[in-house]
Amino acid sequence: MKPSSEEEGELVQGVGPWDECFEVAVQLALRAGQIIRKALTEEKRVSTKTSAADLVTETDHRVEDLIVSELRKRFPSHRFIAEEATASGAKCVLTHSPTWIIDPIDGTCNFVHRFPTVAVSIGFAVHQELEFGVIHHCTEERLYTGRRGQGAFCNGQRLQVSRETDLAKALVLTEIGPKRDPDTLKVFLSNMERLLHAKAHGVRVIGSSTLALCYLASGAADAYYQFGLHCWDLAAATVIIREAGGIVIDTSGGPLDLMSCRVVAAGTREMAVLIAQALQTINYGRDDEK
């Protein structure tokens, strides 16, 4: 369902120093969604980045250029971390300055194949603290938002995570990541097997980490884990999950490190710890060391 003008008005209201930034992010996410929906049905020029499974299209670049250029006009002193700029050699460093963390199309492989699970993700951090996140599920026109201390919403409806604590009653989401060498695939499949041996109801892969995390925030899944995601996949969704009452931690069980390329998220701390304890680590390095 497309957000109504009334709902959009509700979403941009708030009391805080970053209200204008949040409002602009919402409008840009909606504009980006229009571009992505139109391009979804068209022919695409596809390139690869780190592997044959790590894809990029002209639309990724077009959407990122739109978002970054508009934000630079409005907020010239702010910093940016954006997926395609980073792939082209820009440094991925989170400082204390106001910083936008952008994934123009999360689910590019889905986008290429016209599989309708595709999103644009815009996160915002100040003093290395995540302030808000905006994620637009382009094909279903669902707008997920979260602001620190102000709750999380989808098209104006408040989100609430699942309160499940029993892994044997859990639906768990994950993503494969771009590395497909035999050792990485062996550990990936082993981690799924461990959760299934623990009698989890199921393990799902949908091709978009940001939307999987939004489904967790909505209570449609109980946990999420991944090795190989990046800060632009995680920033906006982390705020949304936390504001929906959920937990986001490192796969070691410690506090989340946005640059570590790994995460466990769940509706409850008990569930997050159970997942973290079951996992074998896959090393993807760090975003701020690439």
UniProtKB/Swiss-Prot annotation:
Binding site for substrate: E83, I105, D106, G107, T108, G207, S208, S209, Q226, D233
Tissue-specific expression: Mostly expressed in brain, small intestine, heart, kidney, and spleen (at protein level).
Keyword entries, A-Z: Cytoplasm, Hydrolase, Lithium, Magnesium, Metal-binding
Any one Gene Ontology molecular-function term assigned to this protein's record: inositol monophosphate 4-phosphatase activity
EC numbers, comma separated: 3.1.3.25
Cell compartments where the protein resides: Cytoplasm
Signal peptide: none
Positions annotated to bind Mg(2+) 2: D103, D106, D233
Listed cofactors: Mg(2+)
GO cellular component: cytoplasm
Primary site of residence: cytoplasm
Pathway: Polyol metabolism; myo-inositol biosynthesis; myo-inositol from D-glucose 6-phosphate: step 2/2
Alphabetical list of InterPro entries matching this protein: IMPase, Inositol_monoP_metal-BS, Inositol_monoPase_Li-sen, Inositol_monophosphatase-like, Inositol_monophosphatase_CS
Record flagged with keyword Thylakoid: no
Enzymatic reactions: a myo-inositol phosphate + H2O = myo-inositol + phosphate; 1D-myo-inositol 1-phosphate + H2O = myo-inositol + phosphate; 1D-myo-inositol 2-phosphate + H2O = myo-inositol + phosphate; 1D-myo-inositol 3-phosphate + H2O = myo-inositol + phosphate
GO biological process, one term: phosphatidylinositol phosphate biosynthetic process
Chain residues that bind Mg(2+) 1: E83, D103, I105
Family: Belongs to the inositol monophosphatase superfamily.
Function: Phosphatase that can use myo-inositol monophosphates, myo-inositol 1,4-diphosphate, scyllo-inositol-1,4-diphosphate, glucose-1-phosphate, beta-glycerophosphate and 2'-AMP as substrates in vitro. No physiological substrates has been described yet. Has been implicated as the pharmacological target for lithium Li(+) action in brain.
Protein name (Swiss-Prot/TrEMBL): Inositol monophosphatase 2
Species, as recorded: Mus musculus
